[in-house]
């Protein structure tokens, strides 16, 4: 009995009845879940629809052009398939041997290249990065005790930022652009935000640096090394880490065209951080990669990667969450993925015009890969994973048993913000809009985000919890350096004071109200021909309306140039930089005419509210809006 005074007659205790009822409901819920799993499995088997037919129908329902896929069965057999269109413009059909681009799934292959070098003793995973790339200057406050090591780059615990706009959206990158050019972006680009090794934070920059490591160790372009020393030994003869496109002087006719919503085509373009997301492959070749990942590290009968390193492919090591007992997280190449009551080891991928997913299930010796030639924001890609998992007939895992929570769980209640932010330049947006409220009701932990549906977590013992749509422990509460942290192994949140959040929210609310006042009252005065040039709102209103000027130029500009210095981006920087100055001018005019009437006071308050928000945005690096530096 967790609360109240212990009664002499237990059967008369309302608290006792509450606990018994709670336990009964919990067991009933778990029993229903188990029955539901069996029913779903039986229904799926009874449905009898072909995988190709189901995927084809799903592609149409989701508005996707086409897909290729492969499966590896427990007996080692490989099957491949395709559905939809390889090119929506030409109506060319997708074939099982059509090539696709897989985005960040390329990181798996690059990681294997690094592990191959480690197996050959050409580098060690614990080698500090500074020993290999001394000219690459990191801003690491923990350099003396915790330098960034090779393993930190592999498992995304280096503390480096993910990606900048100009690294991801630029037309200036060429197929042979030196990898170091991706890090020529100022002193704050390579700032380490957390103690290396302590916390997962996905970093495309980290894998860009790993490409440089491979080139330094091998003395050749990383693409050439990986093609010869990783893809060839694995039998991936139709794959390459080199740049491949559908257009230009040397188009690859087998490469599917990339698409966005409504069948808009997009040809492949070079990128700065190509080691993090450049791989052209086929479904058959990805099945061969999956077979290797399911094995003991041998390729063509010979040792390729040591078994010890193979065991670390998806096992998080040394992070705060793993030390607190959470098995979910990312290893040296893959992440643990718990979906639909099946736990696998996976890596997703996204690049312009393409999406992909690679999942292996070592216990069942099974795997699947699926690649899409459409990158659609609102499509449900998870439904395809469900279809492939169902077709593989993977056994369903019962939910982890309920366990007694730690007695101090209630002390973790409060408001949490992402730590670190997925993108350092977006930290203000993540703090204001990406926060999560943690609430404990005595039986379950609730995560209540500002955006999205609340999530209920069931305690499974101590500070470990399981989300209702997971089978294994999915979250952990922990304390580090006096900070309260919530983690699911791939995302970390730190508790912040309510006062800080109230200040941020209040600043935003007051600023928006102030800007709306300038817009509405200013336009009303202008409509009544009562807005002379010396009016307090004249300059602020003009500057506010000027924010519309860059929009048509952005509309006619390719989104792949968002990170470039273009007329549209320069104009956006100018008009956003002028806004706080214009508001300050209006406020100064109010000051000069103070005491002459109530209008001055009425205008001054919203102008002051607007100015404080603009200064806050400038402090966080969002004003002026320089897309080429974000």
Which role fits each region the language model picked out?
Residues 52, 69, 75, 99-126, ...:
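Active-site SXXK
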Residues 38-44:
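N-terminal signal peptide c-region/cleavage motif recognized by signal peptidases
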Residues 379-630:
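Peripheral terminal and inter-domain segments
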Residues 82-88, 141-362, 388:
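Short, surface-exposed loop or secondary-structure junction motifs
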Residues 48-100, 119-124, 135-143, 174-175, ...:
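Short, conserved catalytic-motif segment at the N-terminal edge
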